[in-house]
Structures are given as C-alpha cells and as structure tokens.
Amino acid sequence: MTTGESATKPGLWGWVNKRLPVDQFLRHELTEYYAPKNFNIWYFFGSLALLVLVIQLFSGIFLTMFYKVGEATSFDSVEFIMREVEYGWLIRYMHSTGASAFFIVVYLHMFRAILYGSYKAPRELPWGNMSYWGAQVIVNLFSTIPVIGPGLVEWIRGDYGIADATLNRFFALHVVAVPLALIMLIVLHLVALHQVGSNNPDGVEIKDNEGSDGKPIDGIPFHPYYTVKDIFGVGVFLILFAAVMFFMPTMNDLFLERPNFEEANPLSTPEHITPAWYFGVFYALLRAVPDQQLGALVMLIAILAFFFLPWLDRSPVKSVRYRGWIYKSFLTVFVISFVALNYLGMKPADPGYVYAARVFGVGYFAFFLLMPFYTRWDRTKPVPQRVTFHA
C-alpha cells in the first residue's frame, strides 16, 4: 500500500495518516522490514537494552519527583523515598537494578556484534553508535590533562571540593544530558541499521538473494515474527529482573554498595573505594599503570578501541563460525581478560591485584592491537551463499 492509499482511508485514521504517515512508518520499520531468518538467542539483547532504558527513564522520572539535590538534603531525601513514599523502595530498586541490567545487556549486545562481525562493512556507523553506549568519563580524570587539568576539574565541580554546585551539575547531567544522548544515539543506531539491514550469525547479506517479488529469500518481516520472539524474551527477562529487584536488590554490594547507605562524611574515607561494577574493567586498567596521566590514557584507549574494530579487522569473513583457530583463540583470551579485569577493578589496589591487572591488560589490548595481523593470517572456512540454521 502506498502513502497515498493509506491517506485515503476513511475515518479518523485516514485523517491522521494524511497529516502524519503512521502507516508508512510502521511498514518501513516493522511489517516490511525484512530481517534474516536465522536470528538466535544473541539477538534478544538489542530489544532488551531498549526495554531497560525505558524502565530507567520512567523510574527516574518518579525518583526525581521526591529527590532533593544538595549536601544537606540528598541523603535524607533518598531515605524518605525508601521509607515514606508509597512504593518508593520499589522505584529505587527498579532504578538501581535497571542500571546494572542495562550494562549487562549492552555488553552482551556488543559481544554478539564481535562474534558475528556486525561492525564490518556496511555497518560501521551502526556499530559506532552502539559501542558509544559503553563509554563513560570519570570527571576526576580531567585533572590529568597537562596545564589546564586542575582548573578544568574545578570548573566542572563548580567549587574547590564536592559541594552543592557539583551535585546540581551531576544531577542535571544524569537526568537530562545522559538520557537525551542515549535516546539520540539509539535513534541514529536504528536508522542506520534499517538503512543497511541486519547482520546474521552467518554474516551473509540477505539482500544478495532476492526472489521474483524483490524481497529477500532468506528474510522474514520483523513484525509479527520477531516482535513475538522479542515479547517472549522480554517475559523471561522481566521474571529474572523482578527476582533480583525483590529478593536481591543489592546483589551482595554489587548493584548498591554498602557505603552508599551511610551519609557522606568528608572526614571519613571508605576503606576501599570501588567504581560501579560495570566500570571495573576500565578502573583496573587505570590502576595498573603507575603514572596517573598514562593510566587515564590507557583507560581511554580501552574504551575507544571498540570504535576502530571495522578497520582493524582484515578478515574476509564476518562470522566467528567461519573464522580459524587463531581468531577464536584471541577472542577467548579477550573474554577471559575482560571478566578478570572487571573482577580486579572491584578489589583493593594490592600489589598482587595490580600485577594481575597488568597481565590481563596485555590480553585485552592484544585482541585489538594484533587484530590487523592475525585476522589476515587466519585460515577461514568457505562462507555459504545463503543463511544456515545450525547452532
């Protein structure tokens, strides 16, 4: 059906479509958007990331209705939400659990892209938007910038130390700037993805095999086939999400750290300062380097390295299914290093932990720095002309 045909529909819906082409949008993005037939469990996490972001936005809106920014009011307002606001404890735990859930599904979403080569041409732009989700900047690291660093930190804080001005600025960033940036990046990600089409576990372009009707032979409409699949995945995810939220909201100090249940005291430093668990990888790399400036640079490179994967990978194939043992070995080392660094980042800065972080840091960076060489030398398998359905 063309846009003109949808606009001639009788009644209110036809009137709306004439002014706002809702039918055309739904067809382009859902019913006439063809996705590969062989999506597997790894393709759940994109829709789950969007779901968790919606949970974060709505729970955050309700929290801001009762939260008061300020040195004298912030802690008490959180306690008020937990004890006095009706279902305030539920909203807070929903938001704190959602923060960790968001990074879990985003990391898995990015790992799927690495597995199946979704960053290779023509999907460099969708990959760039997706990899940005994992990037956060610790403000104190600005102090490592030569000459202007200390003054820049003071300007960001708005004071010589953490004060009301700092809390207000961070609150504005957290409530307005970060959500808007994420929404913008997600929209760009989806627009770019629908322009070039989805990748699949085989790394085969379904647009290269079209039927007489001009539609991909190995593709099916996203709706209703994958929307139903995603609804099932959402149901399973929400059961696990609710189990954590109701029975293990702090996840043994991983999701909500114990010191955050104590009022801030500038005269009492916690025994061990740790970042949020999902930044443990980058914090471990930061501590692994003795020099503060070099450590900040190493951490920044560890984040930005994902952006350059489309140009570092010289393999003629996309999917890990058809790559050789060399690439699979480096990928295994990278996964082990990532998990180990995340664990070490939450441990005290003891010499043993710091040394281990340096060892695993080598494994982390070797995956990226040596990629132009081992992907070129690796012996690959023949790639099929059409998608397959093996595990």
How would you label these PLM feature ranges?
Residues 2-101, 105-391:
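Membrane-embedded and interfacial regions of multi-pass energy-transducing membrane proteins
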